[in-house]
Amino acid sequence: MAASQLLAAAVAAAVFLAALLVPPARCQQQQVANPGPRVRQAARIDAVRDELAAEVQAKYGFCMANVQEDFTQAFSFSNASFVSDCMEETQGQMTGMLCGKAEIEIYVKSLGKKPSTRVSRNCDQNSWALGCQPGWACARQDSSSSGREVPSRAVNCRPCYPGFFCPRGLTCMIPCPLGAYCPLATLNDTTGLCDPYSYQITPGSNTACGTADSWADVITTDDVFCPPGHHCPTTTQKFNCTEGYYCRKGSTEEHKCIWKNTCKENSTKEATALFGGILIVILSVVLLLVYNCSDQFIKIRAKILSKSRRKAATIAQESATARGRWKLAKELVLSHELEMSESDQLAASSNEARHATEGNGKRSKNRKKLAHARTERFRRAYSQIGRERVLQPDNDKITLSGVVALAAENRSRRPMFEVVFKGLTLSIGKKKLLQCVTGKLSPGRVTAIMGPSGAGKTTFLNAVLGKTTGYKKDGLVLINGKSGSMQSYKKIIGFVPQDDIVHGNLTVEENLWFSACCRSSKGMSKSDKIIVLERVIGSLGLQEIRNSLVGTVEKRGISGGQRKRVNVGIEMVMEPSLLILDEPTTGLDSASSQLLLRALRHEALQGVNVCAVIHQPSYTLFNMFDDFVLLARGGLIAYLGPISEVETYFSSLGIKVPERENPPDYYIDILEGITKTKMRGHAAPKHLPLLWMLRNGYEVPEYMQKDLEDINNVHELYTVGSMSREESFGDQSENADSVHQNVREPYSLLDRKTPGVLAQYKYYLGRVTKQRLREATLQAVDYLILCIAGICIGTIAKVKDDTFGVASYGYTIIAVSLLCQLAALRSFSPERLQYWRERESGMSTLAYFLARDTIDHFNTLVKPVAFLSTFYFFNNPRSEFKDNYLVFLALVYCVTGIGYTFAIWFELGLAQLCSALIPVVLVLVGTQPNIPNFIKGLCYPKWALEALIIAGAKKYSGVWLITRCGALLKGGYDINNFVLCIVIVMLMGVLFRFIALLSLLKLK
């Protein structure tokens, strides 16, 4: 420890020593018979104590939280027998041998320097009294001298009394603080030292060994410290620690061990490793119970739901069958197909009434059985779905006007959504991705988009949806005849990405239900949501796997085709007005593809505008679509119109599909030049986009003028056997007025209100809880590694009394930061794609972030316990468990926020690298003395380390005061800043969470 650092630390301790007039005066009062002078002397002593306490608090408050308490712990002797003995032996002259304020200042200034600098005027070159020897003192000659001057001391010199220490060159004595052991020394003839101290007396003099000669920090000298394994109730008594107790260095009393057998005689520490093991076992059992019971709770809840669902389905089926029978009987009676006599009619009437009564009785009993709200909701859902199936018309015969009529009752929930695009062009640099795309996507129809690979099918969908950041876009996109941004309508637009972006650690039903809850209309009842959910599950054929986990790459779940249908169902349950699908049938077999298309056609019957990119559909599947968009390379339209007219159109150009050829595949082969064919006139397959433009009267771009010149008799080509522009849309032109009336009616597409932030937060909270409970293995590994790290660091990096554990706590902060930060990456890194999809659909980022952070608070609260259960009991520091817990709680909270930020900013590999590197760098920066304080203040390890040091320093009192002040001064710490350090670390955690939230909002 540097001399300058020791100096300031020792000044604080030395000023305490000036207050030590109290013990001897108190003992002296016992010798005075007259109480009057004793009272006046006590008052003067109290005044001096208060004055010194105020001075110490002002100058050295950084190492003393409470001066009065520190005074009491250091110098309030409950047993002052050594003072009484001293007074008796000196016949009341002990007070004159005590050091004054000026002499104490000399002692303080000499700390950290050579002993030769510690001399008073009584021990200079001209005068060296006998009391100048270490461990010796002399009486004051002039009692009237000022406290600011060193009094003359040259008489009655003698060895220092037990319980006091006499510095070399001062000729006075100072009481030893509590926790010190200052007996009279004995001369060691072999070494010439005065045992148990480290000083020598002048050879050949008539002096003898006195008591201690110094009190300083433990690094400079530990001669006066009560040795470990012993306790010193007074500064002149030393006792062995008895069995069942332990005594640390500088102890004034024995500390009882919780288990007597863990502490043998002269034990210095309690064997707390056993308690750490017990706490680990308890923590493990609790965590296992929580995760296992919670997992069982999820399974039990799923079984209850399944039972209620089956029961409700049975009741709904029975009700539907009964209604069908009564309806048939009624029709037979009304049509007079059943002849009966009047008596028969009366009997039938009576029988009907009886059956009705019985039916009512049965319904009454059923209502009692359906008292549970869950079963009642499922019953209503299945009843509604059953009625829809009965009333559902044949999809192949429905017209657009029929679609409009069927969708009229749902328009309040699903407004009609028509998309018209005119001259849509998309480019990046000089490359054209889409060129002059004109047409429309109509509500109530299912449109297929096809074309060669690289023709721009997905790009076309993104351009229509407005997801064209970084591209140059020209042309118009009209929504119900009005110009506007598609992003404004994202709450009623469903987009199914090409990749199956679903949550693998949720079941099929949980994925769909979450989407239905968060994206449906705000006022939609739970019963209606269940109806929608059951309808989608039924239409997509997901009944058998509804309770199966979707699965991930690491953990197998449902099949790829089933996963694809779940991907589509996530958008269907929110009841969109516009449903866009990017290759929904990829990876599906023919049966699954047809099942999916039937579900999409059912959506179209509700007035939904459905558009899908398709690859190589079968002929049956192709004919299930209403409209067909064929894109050529370069993003040009080769055909856009009804499926029923596509072969007629291409036949008019001389392109006829051979038998047993699939029309869409044949047309794509023509566009790619794989199949050669001879077209009418001088046209070639590369001219198909140009011919489509000419046929519809679209403006031909300049770069296509040359191709236009290559075609002879273009106009004749279209006047002979070709369709008119109006005819190309078949049914659409037939009902144009009806569609226009329903699509253009004054209904705001922005009226749908989805659940607010708080409601979504609740749904997210439930989802994240289920995900965490299904990650029990990962959580267990995290806690196991923390416990192992605590054992290693607690065993190897011991907290030393001289440094208060600065080095070991640095390693501890690195380990906890690294492990908890890496674990926090899992909160956001694995779900980046899912989050993007949910955010683009209009779901709340704030609710998503807060829910994940809220669930992570469980780990924030428990992980410090897991780590301390091993570290604290294997390291056994002096600080209290609760103080350590508060520090590590703040630390885990802070680094978790940093982990969030890295998980959002970087890919998983880079985020892991940063999480491993940053804690090490920040600990090094925060502990280097040559780094500016401003820079160190920005490092959370600096504040965490200071809090840990302060937590330990508070437990060092009495003889440890100088050591405490020196250690705190060296690190620049303040013992009063424990709460401040905790608050700063927590605020850093809040700051990084705020940065992470902003990053989520801006993430592309």
From Swiss-Prot:
Induction (UniProt): Up-regulated in shoots by cold, heat, salicylic acid and 1-aminocyclopropane-1-carboxylic acid (ACC). Down-regulated in shoots by mannitol, abscisic acid, kinetin, benzylaminopurine, indole-3-acetic acid and gibberellic acid. Up-regulated in roots by clod, salt, jasmonic acid, salicylic acid, ACC and benzylaminopurine. Down-regulated in roots by indole-3-acetic acid and gibberellic acid.
Region (Disordered) residue spans: 343-373
TM region positions: 271-291, 776-796, 804-824, 886-906, 907-927, 943-963, 978-998
Topological relation to the membrane, as annotated: Multi-pass membrane protein
Entry-linked InterPro entries: AAA+_ATPase, ABC_transporter-like_ATP-bd, ABC_transporter-like_CS, ABCG_dom, ABCG_transporters, P-loop_NTPase
Signal sequence segment: 1-27
Comp. bias intervals (Basic and acidic residues): 352-361
SMART domains attached to this UniProt entry: AAA
Residue positions binding ATP: 451-458
Domain ABC transporter: start-end pairs: 419-659
Subcellular location: Membrane
Covalent S-S links between cysteines: none
Primary location group: membrane
Keywords in alphabetical order: ATP-binding, Membrane, Nucleotide-binding, Signal, Transmembrane, Transmembrane helix, Transport
Classification via Pfam families: ABC2_membrane_7, ABC_tran
Descriptive protein name: ABC transporter G family member 25
Protein's organism: Oryza sativa subsp. japonica (Rice)
